[in-house]
Structure formats: structure tokens, C-alpha cells
Amino acid sequence: MNVLLVYAHPEPKSLNGSLKDFVVRRLEATGHVVQVSDLYAMQWKASLDENDSLDGKLGERFDPSLDSKHAYKNGRQSEDIAREQDKLRWADAVILQFPLWWFSMPAILKGWVERVYAYGFAYGVGEHSDIHWGDRYGEGMMAGKRAMLIVTTGGWESHYGARGINGPIDDILFPIQHGMLYYPGFDVLPPYLIYRTSRMDTARYARITEELGQRVDELFTAAPIGFRRQNAGAYSIPALTLKDDVAPTLSGFAAHVA
């Protein structure tokens, strides 16, 4: 199978760098074909702007959505964007690996999403009607593909627990897993999380690579997170709110997981 690893850390000799190399070796050892988008090494341009289209802005002002739509539809995107889209088409699974910085992904990775997820490619896809509101949240260009996060953080696991000061890690990652991955159609696997990264020794690193290796081995067999499909009957259309009989006692992010 084909696996794309999108990696965001500025230091090749970091823990993240070592784990990235381990994941690539493990995947290749089990017969998978791997491509790596090392965003810092690529000097990836993180800001979405009019230069993402070979035609520049279409009117007097730059319109991020409409200019993106025009560039994608007419083959006028900048080469770096088109290249990453080709990698996504090629991949059967995508891994996003990054350190948790200020409760989200590094800006360079967010910029990868913003620029590569063009109108007509990752959003603005499918019909809109009284029963179907676009191909998204379980449908879309990435449907049938898998995705997983590998995330490191310096905080303790308890800090990210149900009553932890930072908030539950599933809530922190929800905009990424549900919004950036499930939205265009990926089946999203539970993330692999590494806490207290400053407290690392040889024995702990060995345990982590053993666990991570098992997760990588199960990339195409593990059960995905049970996010509710937008167009499968759980949501009222076009309001896109859960119907009254669906998870009536729940609200917030948890309500959108079956």
C-alpha cells in the first residue's frame, strides 16, 4: 500500500525526527511504499495568498476560495500545491506527524492544509440539496483512504485527561481529526500520543517504538474513530445539527462520535 507521511518538525535530530525515520523503516519493512513530505526541509510556504495561483488574483481583491477554485479547476495552481495533491491522490493512507505547539499543529503544517486543500479538491465538492449537503464528513476526495496522527507533547498525560487543566486531548485534536481529516473523507484512526517528551531515556524510547510499530502495522486494519457521517441520516439538512433522537444527552464534540 502507499503511505504519505507529512512531517513537521524543524530539527532532524529531534525525537520527532527519530520517530519519523522509525516509521518509514517499519512501513517499508512490511512492504509499503512511503513518501515523506518533510515540510521544514522542503521550506514549505505556509501562507495562502494570491501567489498560489499562476494567474494571481482574478479581480481587484484576492478571494481565497474563488481564486483557489479557479486555479484548481484550470490547472493553474502553483507547482508545490499540485505536487502535494498528487501525493494525496496516490496515498492509501496519510500520517500527519507533529509536536503539539500551543494546542495545535505547527503553523507550517496548518499552512500545508490551507494551501493543499483547494476548493474543488478538499472542499466545495458534491451536490447540495435537501438530502445531501456536499461530499464531506465521511465523503469526498479522500473517501476510502485512512489517516492517523502521531503527536508529541511535553505535558503529562494527566494534563490532557477528562479533568486535566489543558482539556481532553480528544477535544484538542477534534478540529484536526474531524475537521481536517474526516471532512474530506478520510477514515481517521485513533492518534498515537507521546507525552512528557523531555523525560526520555533508552528504555522508554524502546517501549514507545514497540507501541508505535504495532500501530503502524495496524494502519490498514485498525478500526477508525466512529465519527458520524454527515449525509447518512444523523443530521438535519441543511441545518446540519444532530437530529433530536441522536445522542440526545450529549453535546459538544462527543456528540459527533457514534
What residue spans do the PLM features occupy?
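Short, structured loop/turn "capping" segments at alpha-beta junctions
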Residues: Y119-G124, E157, F186-P190
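Short connector loops at secondary-structure junctions
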Residues: S37-W44, F186-A203
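N-terminal beta1-alpha1-beta2 submodule of the flavodoxin-like/Rossmannoid cofactor-binding fold
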Residues: M1-V125, E210-A258
